[in-house]
Swiss-Prot record:
Keyword Metal-binding in annotation: yes
GO MF annotations, alphabetized: nucleic acid binding; zinc ion binding
Gene for this chain: ZCCHC24
Zinc finger (CCHC-type): 132-149
Domain of life: Eukaryota
Keyword Mitochondrion part of the UniProt annotation: no
Protein name listed in UniProt: Zinc finger CCHC domain-containing protein 24
Keywords: Metal-binding, Phosphoprotein, Zinc, Zinc-finger
UniProt organism field: Macaca fascicularis
InterPro entries: ZAR1/RTP1-5-like_Znf-3CxxC (IPR027377), Zcchc24_Znf-3CxxC (IPR033446), Zn_knuckle_CX2CX3GHX4C (IPR025829), Znf_CCHC (IPR001878), Znf_CCHC_sf (IPR036875)
UniProt cross-references to Pfam families, sorted A to Z: ZCCHC24_C, zf-CCHC_2, Zn_ribbon_3CxxC_2
Organism phylogeny: Eukaryota, Metazoa, Chordata, Craniata, Vertebrata
Length: 241
């Protein structure tokens, strides 16, 4: 029994609780087996060492006894179980836990999203046809959406935000009357002749076509009393040019 207590004390400092219980269970089994064999074991002679102290000093055939084999088997089982558990915990996942796996996936997602945004930002803009004229700056070489004078949608009162006179199309929101004018300006409207409300153009384009012709009819008289630009200036707005 002293050997069992010594084994339990030494094992408690080395093995985990689950392994310690397994060791105690195997030790109890070995104790019962040893008591069964002690009934048939001859009495030791005077001066001979006790069986516990003579452990490992016997003959080779004694080392192969059931008691020695049981202790060796239990020791090897514990070693094998410990190595197997370590390999399972170490090889369960390269990230170590589910949280690390989630963090790894999120970082990969951010990495690929950054690559996608970068590729879209570097995508070159399509070149317009040679005869295309931008409706904002009246220059060729780019579309209206790529114009350096373009403002965010909804910031201006009119589509055109430049300083030149342009051709505008109007539609009264009250009476649905439509008209066009060659004296359209940025952020300036014209009064509806029927409803007498100021209407801003919903479409504006340059006066000159690619062939150099004016799209407006210069022979028509401009109603200055309906033009907001003329009211602000105090004189005929076309005189600015």
């Amino acid at each position: 029994m002293s050997l069992l207590s010594a084994i339990d004390t030494s094992a408690a400092s080395v093995y985990q609780p689950a392994q310690l219980l397994n060791w105690v269970y195997l030790s109890l089994q070995d104790t019962h087996q040893a008591s069964a064999f002690d009934a048939f074991r001859p009495e030791p002679t005077a001066g001979a060492a006790p069986p516990e102290l003579a452990f490992g000093k016997g003959r080779p055939e004694q080392l192969g006894s059931p008691l020695h084999s049981s202790y060796l088997n239990s020791f090897f089982q514990l070693q094998r179980g410990e190595a197997l558990s370590n390999s399972v915990y170490k090889g369960a996942s390269p990230y170590g836990s589910l949280n690390n796996i989630a963090d790894g996936l999120s970082s990969l997602t951010e990495h690929f999203s950054d690559l996608t945004l970068t590729s879209e930002a570097r995508k070159p803009s399509k070149r317009p046809p040679p005869n295309y004229l931008c409706h904002l700056c009246f220059n060729k070489g780019h579309y209206i959406k790529d114009c350096p004078q373009a403002r965010p949608k909804g910031e201006g009162l009119t589509p055109y935000q430049g300083k030149k006179r342009c051709f505008g199309e109007y539609k009264c929101p009250k009476c649905k009357r439509k008209w066009m004018s060659g004296n359209s300006w940025a952020n300036m409207g014209q009064e509806c002749i029927k409803c007498h409300i100021n209407v801003y153009p919903h479409k504006q384009r340059p006066l000159e076509k690619p062939d150099g012709l004016d799209v407006s009819d210069q022979s028509k008289e401009h109603p200055q009393h309906l033009c907001e630009e003329c009211k602000v200036l105090g004189y005929y707005c076309r005189r600015v040019q």
